[in-house]
Amino acid sequence: MRIGILTGGGDCPGLNAVIRAIVRTCDARYGSSVVGFQDGWRGLLENRRMQLCNDDRNDRLLAKGGTMLGTAHVHPDKLRAGLHQIKQTLDDNGIDVLIPIGGEGTLTAAHWLSQEDVPVVGVPKTIDNDIDCTDVTFGHDTALTVATEAIDRLHSTAESHQRVMLVEVMGRHAGWIALSSGLASGAHMTLIPEQPFDVEEVCCLVKRRFQRGDSHFICVVAEGAKPVPGSITLRQGGMDEFGHERFTGVAAQLGAEVEKRINKDVRVTVLGHVQRGGTPTAFDRVLATRFGVNAADASHAGEYGQMVSLRGQDIGRVPLEDAVRQLKLVPESRYDDAAAFFG
């Protein structure tokens, strides 16, 4: 058997660990070969590929961040228009099964391909942890660790200067990074996309802390956080070519409004892409490895149209159709639990 793999969408700590595990399992357990398509779906459309071998170079991938195959965003319309070319590329390279590793967009494309009779096994990847039907995705723990460490460091400087600090973290639709890093770092408030915020409530919480003699205030803000209607009007950034909203810096805009209303020194830190770069944590290396092994097993078992998934302590498989039906968002009850620590 000959397996094809690609990494799609944004990069993520643990991608190389998945690649390593697939290559090693296919070679050692099944005697199968693996071809990697470069730069995600673009490489599949353009037939740019490389042979992946179970050698010393493959072994060194475990702790390396990013993806050695490269990745890119490709518009779904371009994929649909290129269906014939995709099938031709797979046929020309003798690919029996394709393993796309990616987030919502990549897995949605994988599901579409499976409906077009392409043998596919999906591997979920996102630092946002918003893929449904899996308890967690690799990359999330690393991003959470980076965010928590950054907020830990901001506590001491905020306390020294009696400042209000707003920390913007990733999370377009789901606030898992913000919620967990806020709890782990002892932040005084967390704002997530699932729960619209009122700027006046933010200001009241800040004032209450300083009035009782506390020295500083840390608020974690997910990049996709939105105000309740009538609270504050954010600048509109329009949509990108994929139909995703362009963010215009919610933390900076909120910070300016808070500073104006309470006359306190407010500073904003945007963590940005540092959250998804660098060496994956031990948890992400292990999870990514287990996903890779299971994806290789599923491919050789003929279990196509599936996504590997973590449920409890076990790795299993779920239909791609179920996994891409909706995003996994933060439940209101989880936010309520965190809110007990606000202030």
Swiss-Prot record:
ATP binds at G10, G103, E104, G105, T106. Its cofactor is Mg(2+). GO terms for biological process: canonical glycolysis; fructose 1,6-bisphosphate metabolic process; fructose 6-phosphate metabolic process. Transmembrane segments: none annotated. Keywords: ATP-binding, Cytoplasm, Glycolysis, Kinase, Magnesium, Metal-binding, Nucleotide-binding, Transferase. The record marks G105 as: Important for substrate specificity. Mg(2+) binds at E104. It is an enzyme of class 2 (transferase). GO terms for molecular function: 6-phosphofructokinase activity; AMP binding; ATP binding; diphosphate-fructose-6-phosphate 1-phosphotransferase activity; fructose-6-phosphate binding; identical protein binding; metal ion binding; monosaccharide binding. Its main location: cytoplasm. Signal peptide: none annotated. Pfam families: PFK. Pathway: Carbohydrate degradation; glycolysis; D-glyceraldehyde 3-phosphate and glycerone phosphate from D-glucose: step 3/4. It comes from the Bacteria. InterPro entries: ATP_PFK, ATP_PFK_prok-type, Phosphofructokinase_CS, Phosphofructokinase_dom, Phosphofructokinase_III, PKF_sf. The keyword Ribosomal protein does not apply. Its EC number is 2.7.1.11. PROSITE patterns: PHOSPHOFRUCTOKINASE. PANTHER family: ATP-DEPENDENT 6-PHOSPHOFRUCTOKINASE 3, PHOSPHOFRUCTOKINASE. Homodimer or homotetramer. Catalyzes the phosphorylation of D-fructose 6-phosphate to fructose 1,6-bisphosphate by ATP, the first committing step of glycolysis. This is ATP-dependent 6-phosphofructokinase. It comes from Mycobacterium leprae (strain TN). The gene is pfkA.
